[in-house]
């Protein structure tokens, strides 16, 4: 998404930056891992295809992508990459009033580097992207789809972030969860102001 092309968000446990060409080779290496592809529902692409995908994501108004970096701004940025966090943006019926259509952000987070797991980095990255999208894109409905064997993600979204189950697909063995509106307002609406600094990404 062009809207975040110059946005850098420095939080307490991680830094979020736009997905740039310099990140593609490392991202492609992550996607060579079959388990990561399975859990993220991703297809294996060639490196050239990955570069084309990065260009597409950059210009796609329906996809918001940040690369997750560890808290270290020295040296090469690519050396500090831990994963990514995304929003897939669409219009769907409101769960509060199905006759009304609302803009919905479907969340996806991946901490691909083992050194970045179990430290609350994925949780913070999700909180940051939701708070940023709520404030800048006026998105007020957020959901996530998680396969029923992805225990870490189920724990993250249910227990730590407070998402509530609204559906289950037996065909895909996949839960759908949604962030309650009251929790969005009480916990996420002021998260950036209290926990992060917005900078210009150069």
UniProtKB/Swiss-Prot annotation:
Gene3D superfamilies per the UniProt record, alphabetical: 3.40.630.30
Keywords noted in UniProt: Acyltransferase, Transferase
Disulphide bond pairs: none
Enzyme class: transferase
Every N-acetyltransferase domain range: 34-184
The EC number(s) this enzyme carries: 2.3.1.-
Pfam families attached to this UniProt entry: Acetyltransf_3
GO molecular function terms listed in the Swiss-Prot or TrEMBL record: N-acetyltransferase activity
Similarity comment: Belongs to the acetyltransferase family. GNAT subfamily.
Entry protein name: N-acetyltransferase 9-like protein
Organism: Caenorhabditis elegans
């Amino acid at each position: 998404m062009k809207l975040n092309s110059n946005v850098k968000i420095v939080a307490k446990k991680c830094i979020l930056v736009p997905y740039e060409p310099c990140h593609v080779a490392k991202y492609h290496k992550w996607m060579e891992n079959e388990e990561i592809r399975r859990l993220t529902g991703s297809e294996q692409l060639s490196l050239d295809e990955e570069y084309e995908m990065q260009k597409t994501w950059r210009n796609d108004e329906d996809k918001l992508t940040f690369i997750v970096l560890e808290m270290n701004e020295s040296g090469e940025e690519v050396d500090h990459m831990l994963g990514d966090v995304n929003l897939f943006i669409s219009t769907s019926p409101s769960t509060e009033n199905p006759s009304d259509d609302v803009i919905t952000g479907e969340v996806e987070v991946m901490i691909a580097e083992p050194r970045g797991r179990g430290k609350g980095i994925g949780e913070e990255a999700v909180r940051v992207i939701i708070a940023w999208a709520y404030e800048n894109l006026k998105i007020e409905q957020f959901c996530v789809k998680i396969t029923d064997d992805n225990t870490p993600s189920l724990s993250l979204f249910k227990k730590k972030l407070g998402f509530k189950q609204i559906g289950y697909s037996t065909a895909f063995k996949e839960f759908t969860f949604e962030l309650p509106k009251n929790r969005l307002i009480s916990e996420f609406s002021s998260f950036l102001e209290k926990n992060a600094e917005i900078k210009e990404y150069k």
